[in-house]
Amino acid sequence: MTPEEVIEFLEDKLGREAEEVIVAEGFDRAFLGASLEPPRAIYSIELCIDALTNQGLSTSEAEDQFWGSVATIAEDHENAPIFIHTLT
């Protein structure tokens, strides 16, 4: 998905509550969907790590970057992204 498609999906599914959702910028291809209560974007951990390796990081570096920076995006915020393991 493109960033615009992610936003469009969230607006279509969540309506006004889409404005509250925190998205993980740069990980649009890892976007899977949304939760309703509370409204949150859902991403694949594996696809996020793949996106980082596609930027030139080794798998180890990508995993460190993901768990150290990406997965902690606004982690104390009710509308922070959800990251789940997916089968690949």
Each model region followed by its residue ranges:
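C-terminal alpha-helical interaction appendages
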Residues: 1-88
